[in-house]
Amino acid sequence: MNQVFFSKIRSLVSADRHRFKSKEMDLDLDLSYITDNILAMGFPGTGLEASWRNSIDDVCELLKQKHHGKYMIWNLSERVYDYSKLNNQILEFPFLDHHPPPLSLLFEIVNSLSNWLKADAENVAVVHCKGGKGRTGTIICCYLYYSCQFEIMDDAKNHFAEKRSKMKKGVTQPSQQRYINYFKEIVSGSHMVEEFVLTFRSIELGPLTKDQANSLSFEIFEHAKEPILNFASSSNSIQIVPINNDNSESNNNNNNNNNNNNNNNNQQQQLYKIIILIQKKVQNDVLIRVYRGDTGKGKGKMKKQIFHLIFNIAFVNLDQCLFGMNEFDHFKSSKKYDPNLQMECRFQNNCTGAPDHSFKIWNIMALQYQRTKSSLNNSITDIKSINEINSTNNNNILASSAPTPLTTTTTTTTTTTTTSLPSSEHSTPQILISSSDANLDLKNCNINCDSSSGGGSNSSRNSNSNSRGGSSNSSSNRSSTSSRSSITTDSIKPSCSSDSICNNSSICNNSCNNNNNNNNNNNNNNNNNNNNNNNNNNNKNSNNNNNESSSNSNDDSDSEASIRKRKNTLWSSGSSIKLKPSPNLSRLSLFNGHRQSFTKKINPNNNEENVDQKTLPILKKETNDPSESDIKNVEIIQD
């Protein structure tokens, strides 16, 4: 019962603020997750205060279970509590309730918050004041804008209000909103802060009634310091000046639609304004408090604050600042005063001292914000350009997926290189590989290329697979033999992977099916090659004579076919192959791990290995492609 009773009291105290509720941990806290790593909460109370505010034990349990060793607390209130329960993970930046922090302190708090969250992606910042809305919201909104999570400050304020309040009421005090705008203008580079000294000449406040003017008292502070001046209505330093009736009547007539009873009464009364002569040098932040005094005793005794006002000297335009009633802080009795009530502050810049141009913390943070924003814009531009390139490549792949007519010159097209078969007499097939990660599988005689070269046309592979159907030693089938012996078109098999540029699933499926068909054809061809090799061994003398006569009598295509036929035996699995690679080919990473200083041959009778000390000459060339001489220098040892 006690827990239910206290829970209802806490809900009434927190009013419209979102609460953190967990049945598993049995917690009900005045705490809200503004982002995944920023928390706003009310003051953690102890003893009797914990009955209507957050209990410090419950807060400690939540942080230890969900963010153990990764949390830091910012205490913005003027009060302290037992920090040892939270492992002393607390930073104190106290300033008054319903007030903004001084401008320099505002930047210090946001900078410390940013440094903590940048140190580790899992770090969590917990910010609290008394109620966890006004002062807390001022700091969090400035950080959300400074970290480039929101490009517009109003969006950051709306986000905080939505996450913290059920009625979407976040930072409501005018001076706190004013300092948030100060922060935005400085960080974005819209306003350059120069610390200088001005002479505060006077304050004018009106229109007021006679009783109101006689009961007011004033205090002027340099923010976060003791008051530098005190003024009461009974003293000689305050002048009460009547306002002209014509002006008052015209002002009242303009506001008849907005104010019914109050304006009718003001039209019948003489209105006044208060003029306070100050003549005091001030700088940085200025705080003005207005009180209602006790006029019954004829003294300017301070009784109750009506409102206060805070601004910074660096943002004074020309020689005056004008503030309306909607810019006064904590003005609860505003209905008793004229709606046109305003305060005018006059300054004079007649100081001989030069302004302070030293490098301040806001200058450093402004530079950091500009760098973060520029890097973010560059990353967004890069993402857009990458998306455009991907869409262009997808369109090109879809356009190239259509079948092309079969021609005598087979061409394999990839994303980066193009491989073709020349038909000249003394030319050899060229291997152009676009990826440096190519590997050679000598058993299956396949060159597995990287996914970057996986955009080859399917028509060329289909034409090659069709030409592998049968084999013969006659000259009429040499065209099929030459197409079967082509390294360029038969050995390159692109792999379909997730990193391939073939984003279209149908194209990848077709290419994979074609590769499966080609593998089946290769198995059949290997069996045919074994039979052909046996026939070649039985008819060696006759084939040599035929080859010599055909080499002298046939045309350029016959000589090219004979070269390809010899080369085809190198990749057949039926014979024992020993290769002496060229150093030029090793640069393509095709023969890595296969370089040997001698060749071995196996004697089938006694299963012993005999070392053949014959060495092969290595021809040095400037290109990376195998030439005809490289192929002729390969020793073929057959059983």
Swiss-Prot record:
Residues 243-265, 395-429, 451-498, 519-567, 598-628 are annotated as: Disordered. Residues 619-628 have a biased composition (Basic and acidic residues). Its EC number is 3.1.3.67. The lineage of its organism: Eukaryota, Amoebozoa, Evosea, Eumycetozoa, Dictyostelia. It comes from the Eukaryota. Residues 20-190 form the Phosphatase tensin-type domain. This is Phosphatidylinositol 3,4,5-trisphosphate 3-phosphatase cnrN. Pfam families: PTEN_C2, PTP-SAK.
